[in-house]
Amino acid sequence: NSRVSADDDVYIVGDFCYWSGRTPDWYLRQLKGHKHLIIGNHDKATLDCENAAKYLESVEKMQHVTAEDKQICLCHYPLAEWYKSRHGSWLIYGHIHGARDEVYEFMKTRERALNAGACINNYTPVSFNELVRNNKAFQEKDS
């Protein structure tokens, strides 16, 4: 909450509060900002929680936004191509967390694809520019 204001848009790229001892609405009601959930494969508890919806501005499988003058596709899953990917748009995805497997190796070749995994971003909300820096730092550990 110290990094998010009440007016900020916060995009959760799936797997919200997975393996948690509390209900999703318990977390959502405490978090600042306009929260948008991009559905992940571990979001059944959030989707089934009746009270969670009142804390979410949107719930989508995929969303396209413009932020900081950039076209961005948000999807829980890493994609080989995405909306306007050949025209300079960015992809922000989750799902693979901090894995360094063949999917990770492939996604490193996608110039404007960013892993929003919490483990890559110090388990804290980040801006677009911080996401870029954190992905670069994570990839530099491969060298």
Where on the chain are the PLM-derived regions?
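Conserved beta-sheet core of the metallophosphoesterase superfamily
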Residues: 52-142
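Core catalytic region of metal-dependent phosphoesterases/phosphodiesterases
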Residues: 1-62
